[in-house]
Swiss-Prot record:
This is UDP-N-acetyl-D-mannosaminuronic acid transferase. GO terms for biological process: enterobacterial common antigen biosynthetic process. Catalyzes the synthesis of Und-PP-GlcNAc-ManNAcA (Lipid II), the second lipid-linked intermediate involved in enterobacterial common antigen (ECA) synthesis. Pathway: Bacterial outer membrane biogenesis; enterobacterial common antigen biosynthesis. The keyword Phosphoprotein does not apply. Keywords: Glycosyltransferase, Transferase.
Length: 245
C-alpha cells in the first residue's frame, strides 16, 4: 500500500494518519509477511493539549512515524475540520491485540517491555496460547536507568520486529526514541495499561460504551479522580467550536 494513499490530517499542528478502520491500518503496516519499521503513537485530546506546554512531548510527537486517532474527540475534530475525511477511532488496546494476532499468523518476532512481573508473565502466556505469538524476549517495568542500555542490546540481539512498551506516556515514548537509536529495524508501539486490560486485571468499558464513543465517561465513572483531567479537555472543546483545530 502506497504511503501517499493514506491521508494525513493536521490537528493543532500534529499530522494524524487517516486510517478508515483497523483492517486498513494493519494492511498498511504489513506488506505481506513483512512489517514496517517506525513508531506508533496514539493521539487523544489530552495528549494534544499537554504537548502545547510540554516541549519534550511535542518533539516526541513530531518525531513519531505514525500518529493515529485513539480518542473520539480527535476523530470528531478531524471530521469537523475535514468534512470528507474517512477516519475512524482506533483504540490503542484494540490495535495492539490486532497487531499481536497478525504477528502470530506471520511468525513476526515480538519483544514485550513494561508492566508488573506477574502481569507480563500472564500476557506472554496468553499471547502464546491464543495466537501462537513468537515472543523472543521480555522485560518487566522494574528496571533501572542503568539497566536500560543493556536492555536495548537485548532487544537488538533478539531480532524483534515488533516491540511494545507498557510504561505510560511519556516514559514509553522516551524509551522508544532511545531504543530506536540502537535497534531501528522494528515497529515500536507504546501501549500504556494494555497488558493489564488484556490479562483481566483492569476492566475496560463495555463494547456498547466503546461504540458510542463514551469510553472516557466509563473511565470517569469508574475513577472519579479523573474529573480534573476531564475539565482540562474543555480547552479542546473550545478549539473545536471556534474552528481553531
Amino acid at each position: 500500500m502506497d504511503t501517499n494513499s493514506i491521508p494525513k490530517y493536521s490537528i493543532r499542528g500534529h499530522n494524524i494518519w487517516g486510517f478508515k478502520d483497523m483492517a486498513h491500518f494493519l494492511d498498511y503496516l504489513y506488506q505481506g509477511a513483512q512489517i514496517k519499521s517506525g513508531s506508533l503513537i496514539a493521539i487523544n485530546a489530552e495528549k494534544i493539549l499537554t504537548a502545547e506546554t510540554d516541549k519534550g512531548l511535542n518533539q516526541l510527537l513530531d518525531e513519531a512515524d505514525y500518529l493515529y486517532a485513539d480518542g473520539i474527540s480527535v476523530v470528531r475534530g478531524i471530521r469537523r475540520k475535514y468534512p470528507d475525511a474517512q477516519v475512524s477511532r482506533i483504540a490503542g488496546a484494540d490495535l495492539w491485540e490486532a497487531l499481536m494476532e497478525r504477528a502470530g499468523k506471520e511468525g513476526t518476532p515480538v519483544f514485550l517491555v513494561g508492566g508488573k512481573p506477574q502481569v507480563l508473565a500472564q500476557t506472554e502466556s496468553k499471547l502464546k496460547a491464543q495466537w501462537n505469538v513468537n515472543i523472543v524476549g521480555s522485560q518487566d517495568g522494574y528496571f533501572t536507568p542503568q539497566d536500560r542500555d543493556a536492555l536495548f542490546e537485548r532487544i537488538k540481539a533478539s531480532g524483534a520486529k515488533i516491540v511494545t512498551i507498557a510504561m505510560g506516556s511519556p516514559k514509553q515514548e522516551l524509551f522508544i526514541r532511545a531504543c530506536r537509536q540502537v535497534h531501528p529495524d522494528a515497529l515500536y508501539m507504546g501501549v500504556g495499561g494494555t497488558y493489564d486490560v488484556f490479562t483481566g486485571h483492569v476492566k475496560r468499558a463495555p463494547k456498547a460504551w466503546q461504540n458510542l464513543g463514551l469510553e472516557w465517561l466509563y473511565r470517569l465513572l469508574s475513577q472519579p479522580s479523573r474529573i480534573k483531567r476531564q475539565f482540562k479537555l474543555l480547552k479542546f472543546v473550545g478549539y473545536y467550536y471556534s474552528n481553531k483545530l
